[in-house]
Amino acid sequence: MKRGEALQAWGRVLAGRLPAMSIEITKECPLRCPGCYAYEDQHLGGPVTLRQLVDRKGSALVEGVLALVDRHRPLHVSIVGGDPLVRFRELEVLLPLLNQRGVFVQVVTSAFRPIPLAWAELSRLNICVSIDGLQPEHDERRKPATYDRILKNIAGHRVIVHCTITGQMMKRAGYLEEFMQFWSPRPEVLKIWMSMFTPQRGQELPECLTPAERQQAIDDLLRLRRLYPKLGMGGRTIREFARPPASPAECLFAQTTQTLSADLKTRITPCQFGGDPDCSRCGCMASMALQAVAHREVAPGITIGKVALISLGVGRTVSRFRPSGIRVAPNAAVIPDRT
């Protein structure tokens, strides 16, 4: 995060607004990926699931998203799903309008269909393509969004490749490096991000990493970032995987991001995973990146996390006098110092 962007985000928080918004713009997805948190029964925190929501299409979707952005004025909007490319016609209208508003947008997709070339001209847009490991495993998990189809559909773009590390991957030595060897040389790849699988509390799925596998993944990433410059993760961010936030109240990402589901009304809490995520096994790269920022000192004994706590408190007070604003989460807690 650049200094100017950080100051803008701080200003939003002090004004009682959240600087980031994540929108599940559709409930539809042609994939059926094992372990997908969006389709967990408790993702929305109640009896209704994502597939049961009434989502929007056409001009109603475009107007609904623009109304949210104009009302809440986030600096950054993540467009997720489902898969956003299910609504690619709406995005062809929406993305240029968001770009004109000065909003930075990230579209997270499986790239199961061609990404319109016109999107490559939008200065405030990132395309993040989800890829689950090497081709044999990925193609089995994410068909029809196979390697061959992805390579064809991202042609002419510079995308971010995002891989979620799973327990299955870490059972084979050298797996992450093989992944880097394939994707790093590709001209279509701008950078590569890695997260780790985040289960719900009590889940023991094949995707879950053991403590030893988690530490091995950290060690591998710290080594690989020196060999592959496209691995766009700093050492501080990678080390945070060893000490994730203890709860959403201690997670700067959760506290500063408003997440809405496909009806554009239902809030997803306590963070983008919804349900009851096991924070002790959190693998969210965005969370780790912001925690790395939170633990930096701005003065002896004063971390950015402490400043953020005070700012969130001020923002909550301010937001009470503006009914139309998004209320900052009332359960914000101190971002713990790390030694």
Model regions: which residues?
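Flexible mid-to-C-terminal extensions adjoining Fe-S/redox cofactors in radical SAM and related proteins
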Residues: 17-19, 248, 260-339
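Local cysteine-cluster metal-coordination motifs and their immediate loop/turn environment
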Residues: 28-40, 250, 277-286
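Radical SAM enzyme [4Fe-4S]-AdoMet core and its adjacent flexible, acidic
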Residues: 48-49, 70, 101, 123-254, ...
